[in-house]
Structures are given as structure tokens and as C-alpha cells.
């Protein structure tokens, strides 16, 4: 179990291994090396990042400041063009990806910010993330549209669960469309969106409305809350339904009665849905570890 946590500190199996260690009283919680985020100053965080990248030198601070100014003034396209002039020669630098990713996130250019966060995660040795600064983990697991998500989630559903679904469904790109036609941040199908809009009292709904981030969040959270009630607060089958529809999810729920979490997860017969459930729940447990108590 410890080897699994150390080798894959972010994700589903790290958490499940931790639960096994705790349940069997093999280790106290404080001795289990789950990725929780080390509190470090901004300077210490940058030093940690530069140590991991093992690349000398630095990127252009002048260009960075100019991109920042353009974003501040609302010239987003110009900012992106200027950013691209530096990206090609710095795309392998972790400090570059981190700095610009946070800059775009602060400017509410969420999709661009998360593209850089994904590039950062793909380039860093995953094992070192167990001891990563908390600001690095929060960069990889961000909270965009925070006021809207927390407002609509309320006490009916954990907002960190909503973010976990959003991260997996759309990589935080409000304009994204799936091959089967699901749209926006929480990847809602037009027919489902129409039904949800009616339930929410929204008139004159059009499928393209799902590309509106704030409406998509409203409808998506309504859908997740309804599913949570339908499946008796069991997030495993909420996700099963969200990914594969109600018929297989109901079948899996019935077959899983009385079984442990791990057996129920493995009993999901669609491998795509089984993988989806594990990825989203892995996201969720990380969000809980690194964000709870900070807001």
C-alpha cells in the first residue's frame, strides 16, 4: 500500500491504499504519505519548482509583465499572442508553466490556465508531488468560478465533488463539445439541458446556452444534486449515471448491495465508466485534502 501511495500520490489508488492502512490499523494517519500539500512561501515554492525542473536560467520577466498588463487591460487575444512568442522556447520549464498558468487563472482565462497546469503535471516526476507545496497542488486542482459553484452547491452537494466532475468532463473549457454532443463545463447533453432548464424555470432555452459557463454550472449542479438524492448520496452511482445513464447505474447499484467500496467499483461492467468513476473520485479526494479548511 505504501509503495502505491509513493508511486502514484495523486489519485484513486493512493486514497484507497490509505484507507486500507487506516482500517487495518497498520499506520497512523500522520505517517501515511498522502499528497496534502506542504505550506511554503511563494519564494520557497518557486525554489522547489526550479529544483524539480533541473533547467538553468530563467524565462523573460519583461514579456511576463507585458502579458500581465495586457490581461489587466482586457486585451486577451494580444496577451495570448505575446505569450506564444515565449512559449515555444520555455514550454519545458516548470517555473514558466506555473507562473503563466497562475497569471491566466487570475485573469479568468481558465481553459488556458488549466492547459498549462496539465502540461506542468505531465512534465514533473509524479512521485515528488507527494511532498509538493500546497500552492502547486492547488494549481493542478483549481477552483475557477468559485462564487458560482459554492452558491449553487450550497449545502446540497459538496462543491469539491462538482469541481472533480468538471475537471474530468471538460478540463475547465466552457466552450468544449464532446463527440456525442455534450456541451460546456459539466458536459450536459442538449436534451438533458432542456429538461433541467424547465425544472429551473428557465425559458427559451437553446442548446448553445450550455456554453454559458454560469448557466452550465447552474444546470449541472442541479443535475448532480438530483442524482445524489436518487442514489441515496452514493457518489459512485451518481457518477455511473452521469457517465453511462440510469439503466446500467441502477443495475450496478443493485448488484453492489452489501459489497465493499472496492468490490462495487470493480463490479462496474463498462470499463470506460469504471475508469471514469475512479478518476473523478481520485480528483475529489485530492480536492478535499488540499482545499478543505482553507476557505
Residue spans for each PLM region:
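Catalytic glycan-binding domains that act on GlcNAc-containing polysaccharides
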Residues: 1-37, 78, 88-295
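Long, low-complexity, highly charged intrinsically disordered regions
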Residues: 31-58
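Alpha-helix N-cap/N′ positions at the starts of helices
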Residues: 44, 58-65, 95-96, 144
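TPR-adjacent "capping" and linker segments in tetratricopeptide-repeat scaffold/adaptor proteins
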Residues: 48-61, 85, 136-141
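Alpha-helical segment of the N-proximal tetratricopeptide repeat
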Residues: 55-85
Amino acid at each position: 500500500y505504501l509503495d502505491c501511495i509513493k508511486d502514484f500520490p495523486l489519485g484513486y489508488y493512493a486514497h484507497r491504499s490509505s484507507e486500507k492502512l487506516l482500517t487495518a490499523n497498520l499506520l497512523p494517519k500522520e505517517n501515511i504519505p498522502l499528497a496534502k500539500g506542504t505550506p511554503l512561501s511563494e519564494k520557497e515554492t518557486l525554489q522547489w519548482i526550479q529544483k524539480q525542473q533541473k533547467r538553468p536560467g530563467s524565462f523573460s520577466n519583461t514579456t511576463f509583465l507585458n502579458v500581465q498588463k495586457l490581461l489587466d487591460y482586457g486585451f486577451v487575444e494580444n496577451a495570448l499572442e505575446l505569450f506564444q512568442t515565449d512559449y515555444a522556447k520555455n514550454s519545458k520549464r516548470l517555473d514558466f508553466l506555473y507562473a503563466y498558468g497562475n497569471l491566466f487563472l487570475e485573469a479568468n482565462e481558465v481553459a488556458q490556465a488549466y492547459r498549462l497546469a496539465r502540461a506542468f503535471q505531465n512534465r514533473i516526476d509524479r512521485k515528488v508531488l507527494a511532498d509538493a507545496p500546497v500552492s502547486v497542488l492547488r494549481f493542478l486542482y483549481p477552483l475557477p468560478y468559485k462564487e458560482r459553484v459554492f452558491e449553487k452547491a450550497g449545502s446540497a452537494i459538496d462543491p469539491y465533488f462538482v469541481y472533480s466532475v468538471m475537471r474530468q468532463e471538460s478540463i475547465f473549457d466552457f466552450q468544449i463539445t464532446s463527440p456525442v454532443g455534450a456541451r460546456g463545463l459539466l458536459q450536459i447533453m442538449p436534451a438533458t439541458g432542456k429538461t433541467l432548464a424547465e425544472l429551473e424555470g428557465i425559458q427559451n432555452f437553446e442548446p448553445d446556452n450550455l456554453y454559458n459557463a454560469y448557466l452550465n454550472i447552474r444546470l449541472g449542479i442541479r443535475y448532480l444534486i438530483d442524482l445524489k438524492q436518487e442514489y441515496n448520496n452514493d457518489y459512485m452511482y451518481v457518477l455511473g449515471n452521469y457517465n453511462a445513464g440510469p439503466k446500467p447505474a441502477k443495475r450496478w447499484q443493485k448488484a453492489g448491495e452489501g459489497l465493499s467500496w472496492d468490490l462495487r467499483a470493480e463490479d462496474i461492467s463498462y470499463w470506460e465508466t469504471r475508469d471514469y468513476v475512479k478518476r473523478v473520485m481520485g480528483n475529489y479526494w485530492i480536492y478535499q485534502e488540499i482545499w478543505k479548511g482553507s476557505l
